[in-house]
Amino acid sequence: MRVEWIIMADSAEVVNGKLYLMGGGWDHLVINQPFPTQQLISIAVSFSVGWDETNIRQPMEIRIEDMEGKQLARVNGEIEAGRPRGITPGQAQRVQLAFKLPLRIEKPDRFSVTALIADEIAGHASFGITAGRRQRRQRQQPEAKPEKPKLDA
């Protein structure tokens, strides 16, 4: 079994074996909110299950980590593909999964998405998050000092 691809998206779901994406395929997000912030993302993963691996349950795991190795999210599960009637002998099967994950983003950074099958790394992707223009401006402006009240004599 191998990972064919990992896609980041604003929204993703798999229905009847078909992947539906909205805002998919990005590798960079701009956040216009103060950090730390909560960000909902979706991840779609495609696994290719070889003919000789069908009808065997395999453990899988998806991890999202920052560049310091701090884990932001983890999904555990199992993958098992059967052999549909009429399939050509030897043909691999595709299993697609999609996950919606709320991430707590502490600061602008790069993040890694790692897919594991049976505790072995099978695929990897990465994405970055930066502060939007509004957030950069707020950090650069000095804090305004309160004016002293004027007393009329």
Language-model-derived ranges and their functions:
Residues 2-105, 110-117, 121-153:
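Contiguous segments within soluble domain cores/interaction surfaces
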